[in-house]
């Protein structure tokens, strides 16, 4: 179920503060965040966030197409190695 429209998008307050500070400083450095649940807002376009995936911060460059999505969608937490190959099928 999606979030109610009247509530508006959820963003952790520290993410907003860090983004605002980065805009004011003018530097284009990676902003480290741990809030995968926060929504990407239009004011984040052009910034680079380091989204934590449980092991390291994955750099994510924010574009206009990402507005309304969550930060966690761009930082996968699981690594897929593929299914184990069938040894009997390889021998033939």
Swiss-Prot record:
Listed as disulfide-bonded, the cysteine pairs are none
Q: Name the family the entry cites.
A: Belongs to the universal ribosomal protein uS19 family.
Q: Which GO terms describe its cellular component?
A: cytoplasm; small ribosomal subunit
Record's function text: Protein S19 forms a complex with S13 that binds strongly to the 16S ribosomal RNA.
Q: Which GO terms describe its biological process?
A: ribosomal small subunit assembly; translation
The name under which this protein is listed is Small ribosomal subunit protein uS19
Report the domain of life of the source organism.
Bacteria
Q: Does the keyword RNA-binding apply?
A: yes
One Pfam short name? Ribosomal_S19
- GO: which molecular function terms? rRNA binding; structural constituent of ribosome
């Amino acid at each position: 179920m999606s979030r109610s429209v009247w509530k508006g998008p959820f963003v952790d307050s520290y993410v907003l503060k860090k983004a605002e500070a980065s805009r004011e400083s003018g530097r284009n450095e990676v902003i480290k965040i741990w809030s995968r649940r926060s929504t990407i807002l239009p004011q984040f376009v052009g910034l680079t966030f380091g989204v934590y995936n449980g092991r390291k911060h994955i750099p994510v460059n924010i574009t206009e197409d990402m507005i309304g999505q969550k930060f966690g969608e761009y930082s996968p937490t699981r690594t897929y190695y593929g299914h184990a190959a069938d040894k009997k099928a390889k021998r033939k």
